[in-house]
Amino acid sequence: MSERVERNWSTGGWLLALCLAWLWTHLTLAALQPPTATVLVQQGTCEVIAAHRCCNRNRIEERSQTVKCSCFSGQVAGTTRAKPSCVDASIVLQRWWCQMEPCLPGEECKVLPDLSGWSCSSGHKVKTTKVTR
């Protein structure tokens, strides 16, 4: 009986040592990894950090982008002249999209009927933007 207890205790000790060695290895490897670069954005500005582009079966080009903004108090991320920017928060809260001047000069801005975004049109070309959260 005492031999069996010693054998089990010995196995438990080895398991504990193995787990501690595994943990130490992972912590050491994590410490050797270079730090992840953080993008600092100047207060009151926005920066595109990822952009995606594709076409659906109707030959309509779809684009999306991820933006990092550092806005002043009372401002939120928005769009001005087709570029990411900080805009007054009331524009976004009340969905008065065209007040942030999202279109390029010469384009006409119209809010979508369901207030989910806006469209910019010039001649026969129409660009529609839908806001997602």
From Swiss-Prot:
GO terms for cellular component: extracellular space. Pfam families: TAFA. One of its GO terms (molecular function) is receptor ligand activity. Disulfide bonds: none annotated. It is found in: Secreted. Brain-specific. Keywords: Secreted, Signal. Residues 1-30 form the signal peptide. InterPro entries: Chemokine-like_TAFA (IPR020350), TAFA_chemokine-like (IPR051743). GO terms for biological process: negative regulation of microglial cell activation; positive regulation of microglial cell activation. Its main location: secreted. Belongs to the TAFA family. Plays a role in the regulation of microglia polarization. This is Chemokine-like protein TAFA-3.
